Amino acid sequence: MATSGTYVTEVPLKGSAEKHYKRWRSENHLFPDAIGHHIQGVTIHDGEWDSHGAIKIWNYTCDGKPEVFKERREIDDENMAVTFRGLEGHVMEQLKVYDVIFQFIQKSPDDIICKITMIWEKQNDDMPEPSNYMKFVKSLAADMDDHVLKA
């Protein structure tokens, strides 16, 4: 069995958890304008922008390289959490399992955290651990903060 693991980190954000959650849950089409240095495009492959089970295709830049990611969306409104379950793409060439959960938690009236949990399993033990992808998704949440505050 190949190596697997879970990374967890928290990104401090400003404003309301509801507003941030809404952006990640149903406004992905705004990502290229908001954080175009990371995300160049997001398209719907199956479903609707805000539907549980929707399949989206992302064009992004990680470590200076253009990549593509196809994911199935899981939505948990009660816990303000969105899961991106990896289906295909560059990251899936290295990993059998790649699930990223973004959960938005209000800490005070003006402060929230985005708790990011990445669950992964390598295709084989020769593949590197996906720490670069954790760094990437952490930067997505941090860089989206200003754009959400201005919305």
Curated annotation (Swiss-Prot):
Q: Give any GO molecular function from the UniProt entry.
A: copper ion binding
- This protein's source sits in the domain of life called Eukaryota
Gene Ontology terms: cellular component: cytosol; mitochondrion
Biological process (GO), any one: vegetative to reproductive phase transition of meristem
SUPFAM superfamilies, alphabetically?
A: Bet v1-like (SSF55961)
The family note in this entry says: Belongs to the MLP family.
Name it.
MLP-like protein 328
Q: Which gene encodes it?
A: MLP328
